[in-house]
Amino acid sequence: MAHKKAGGSTRNGRDSEAKRLGVKRFGGESVLAGSIIVRQRGTKFHAGNNVGCGRDHTLFAKADGKVKFEVKGPNNRKYISIVAE
């Protein structure tokens, strides 16, 4: 009878789940206090007026209003603010 030796086992076959990072509310959108605006690793975006920063660097609205993205400062940092309507 024909025989075939067993193949070796592989050490691949793992992958981490996607973390669903990114901008959740874009410029000009209305948000309520507590709404998540951006989920990020590190501070790609910085918190501006009426925006809080969670311990995982998630930016969230502290007040109701419209989202405003702006670039300012000598290092051209990106700030996100909430402008009251």
UniProtKB/Swiss-Prot annotation:
Superkingdom to which the source organism belongs: Bacteria
Coiled-coil blocks: none
Gene Ontology annotations for the cellular component aspect, listed alphabetically: cytosolic large ribosomal subunit
Pfam families: Ribosomal_L27 (PF01016)
An individual GO BP term: translation
Region called Disordered, residue ranges: 1-20
Keyword annotations: Ribonucleoprotein, Ribosomal protein
Molecular function as annotated in GO: structural constituent of ribosome
Similarity comment text for this entry: Belongs to the bacterial ribosomal protein bL27 family.
Database matches in PANTHER family: LARGE RIBOSOMAL SUBUNIT PROTEIN BL27M (PTHR15893:SF0), RIBOSOMAL PROTEIN L27 (PTHR15893)
Name listed for the protein in its UniProt record: Large ribosomal subunit protein bL27
